[in-house]
A protein has these predicted regions:
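Exposed, low-structure sequence patches enriched in small/polar residues
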Residues: 1-214
Length: 214
C-alpha cells in the first residue's frame, strides 16, 4: 500500500493511493486464494470559504473464482449559502465488468442543510435519483442519520430516494432526533427479500432517538 497528497497550487489538492494485495489462503466469502488491486485518485478544489469541489476516481480489481473489475467516479460540490444554510450536490457513476459482461449505473443527489444560529434545531433534506443495471452496480447514498447512527444505504435498479432528518436540543441535557426515509422503485413490484420483503414498490423507514445526558 502506498498513498500520497500533493498541493501543487493554493486551493488545489491531489490525493492518491495504490493497494495491491494477495491472500494465499481461504477467507470469508472466498473459497480459493485470491489477489487484487485498488487505486484511487482525488482532486480537491476550494476556490473560497463557501465552496469546495472534488472529483474522485476509484478502480478495483479482484482475481478470485470469478474475476471482475470495477470503476467508480464521484463528483461533489459543497456550497455554504449562509451561516445556517448549506447545499451538497453530487453525481456518481459506476461500471462493473465480469466475464466480459458490463453493467453500469448512476446516481444524482442534492442535499440541503439548515442549522439556524439562534435556534437549537437542525434539519437536512436529501433527494437522489438512481438508475443501475443490477445489484453489482449499487450506489451508496450519502445522507445524514440520527445521532450516533451512521447510515449509508445502497440502491440499485431505478427509482428515487428521499430522506429528511431532524434534531432538536430541547434543553442542555435533553435532545430528540428523527429521520424519515422514502424510496420509490420504478422497476419492481416487490422490495426486499425473505423477512424484509415488502409488497409494492415503495419502502419507508423511520428512526428516532431521545437522548438524556446526566
Amino acid at each position: 500500500y502506498i498513498g500520497m497528497q500533493w498541493t501543487p497550487f493554493a486551493r488545489w489538492k491531489l490525493s492518491a493511493y495504490a493497494d495491491v494485495f494477495r491472500f494465499p489462503w481461504l477467507k470469508y466469502g472466498v473459497d480459493a486464494p485470491s489477489t487484487g488491486k485498488e487505486y484511487m485518485l482525488q482532486l480537491d478544489y476550494t476556490p473560497s470559504r463557501n465552496l469546495s469541489v472534488y472529483v474522485r476516481y476509484k478502480y478495483k480489481q479482484r482475481e478470485n473464482i470469478t474475476p471482475y473489475h470495477q470503476q467508480r467516479l464521484r463528483m461533489q460540490a459543497l456550497y455554504t449559502i449562509s451561516s445556517s444554510v448549506s447545499l451538497r450536490t453530487s453525481a456518481d457513476g459506476i461500471c462493473y465488468t465480469e466475464a466480459n459482461e458490463k453493467s453500469r449505473g448512476w446516481m444524482i443527489a442534492q442535499s440541503v442543510g439548515w442549522k439556524p444560529v439562534d435556534v437549537p434545531v437542525q434539519t437536512d433534506f436529501h433527494i437522489a435519483g438512481f438508475h443501475t443495471d443490477n445489484y453489482r452496480t449499487r450506489i451508496s447514498s450519502y445522507e445524514k442519520n440520527i445521532l450516533y447512527a451512521f447510515n449509508m444505504p445502497s440502491f440499485y435498479g431505478k427509482g428515487v430516494r428521499l430522506a429528511l432528518s431532524f434534531r432538536w436540543d430541547i434543553v442542555k441535557q435533553l435532545s430528540v432526533s428523527a429521520k424519515l426515509g422514502y424510496t420509490y422503485y420504478a422497476d419492481r413490484d416487490v422490495v426486499g427479500t425473505d423477512l424484509e420483503e415488502i409488497e409494492g414498490n415503495i419502502k419507508a423507514d423511520i428512526y428516532t432517538l431521545l437522548r438524556w445526558k446526566f
